[in-house]
Amino acid sequence: VIPMPFYINEKMYLEGVTLTQEEFYEKLKKDEPISTSQPSPADLCDLWDKLLRDYEEIVHIPMSSGLSASCSTAMGLAIDYNGRVQVVDNQRISVTQRQSVMDAKMLAEAGKSAAEIKKILTDQKLDSSIYITLDTLKYLKKGGRITPAAAAIGTVLNLKPVLQIQGEKLDAYAKVRGKKQAKRAMLKAMKNDWETRFKEYASDGEMCLQAAYTGNLEEAEEFKKEIQEVFPGMEIHMDPLSLS
């Protein structure tokens, strides 16, 4: 895993290496200036060169090309490795990106080549959904995704956006009043996907449900229970990312 760099007050940090998630969110709450970046080409090539001393091939799974330039950077660098580095753009992020890594590991253990793994993961790129809700509209406003006026109205009316990722970009799914309604909207969307888009996977027992959160474990555990009520018998994997 290569950490993603970000800048706070113009000082660079590495995710999970030089700053913990708790420290990051504490600085975020204090409105310290934060910007994101991507791993440098030199760091990425150094990692690949190190791995290729012990392995024949690499399957590199970056964030979705629609959400980060790190994917196109990796693809450009991989050209010089004559096929030994296969970069997968299967439009995944967060828990679905993690699942792609686990799937790639399973395929490698089954004897698939790096090129074969890339094709399988790419062919399955639309076989996932992410639904996200946010506590505040402040960061959408700061990132330019909504106007200050829309953020102000949303705050006054206690509107909570529900966002979705089905493909390469983050899109609006619904706007509801309060977090309770936002969670209900996500559960309804998940149930609909289960019964329509992923019906065949569900009937074959090949579905995977995951929940993620940021700095709110207690609330995330409660949401996990709500998911289990809708999908009894399903194991829910938890990741400390965002309440999603």
Describe the function of each predicted region.
Residues V1-P39, D43:
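N-terminal glycine-rich anion-binding loop in soluble enzyme alpha/beta folds
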